[in-house]
Amino acid sequence: MSTRRQAITLYRNLLRESEKLPAYNFRMYAVRKIRDAFRANKAIRDFAEIDRQMEAGKQNLELIRRQVIIGHLYTADKLVIENKKTLSPLDD
């Protein structure tokens, strides 16, 4: 598999796993960090550096997977911002 395809697959896997984080703040932070990291490293052309970044990404993927499991073991109430129901001023 080409390096580009591997990077895209890793990016998608990281985003998918981070969306599973139960805590809103951690979830949004993880998504933002993943996007920022991939944008920052987009211009890298050195294959050794690409390999280092890919390995770091794989380690981060495993870390996120562990955090998802831990987060589901110790769940907390959802934040108000996470509720799907829109509140109306007429609702009392």
Swiss-Prot record:
Component of the mitochondrial core iron-sulfur cluster (ISC) assembly complex at least composed of the cysteine desulfurase Nfs1, the scaffold protein IscU, the accessory protein bcn92/Isd11/Lyrm4, and probably fh/frataxin. Interacts with Nfs1. InterPro entries: Complex1_LYR_dom (IPR008011), Complex1_LYR_LYRM4 (IPR045297), ISC_assembly_LYR (IPR051522). GO terms for cellular component: L-cysteine desulfurase complex; mitochondrion. The gene is bcn92. It comes from the Eukaryota. Belongs to the complex I LYR family. CDD domains: Complex1_LYR_LYRM4. It is found in: Mitochondrion. Stabilizing factor of the core iron-sulfur cluster (ISC) assembly complex that regulates the stability and cysteine desulfurase activity of Nfs1 and participates in the [2Fe-2S] clusters assembly on the scaffolding protein IscU. It comes from Drosophila subobscura. One of its GO terms (biological process) is iron-sulfur cluster assembly. This is LYR motif-containing protein 4 homolog. Keywords: Coiled coil, Mitochondrion. Residues 40-68 form a coiled coil.
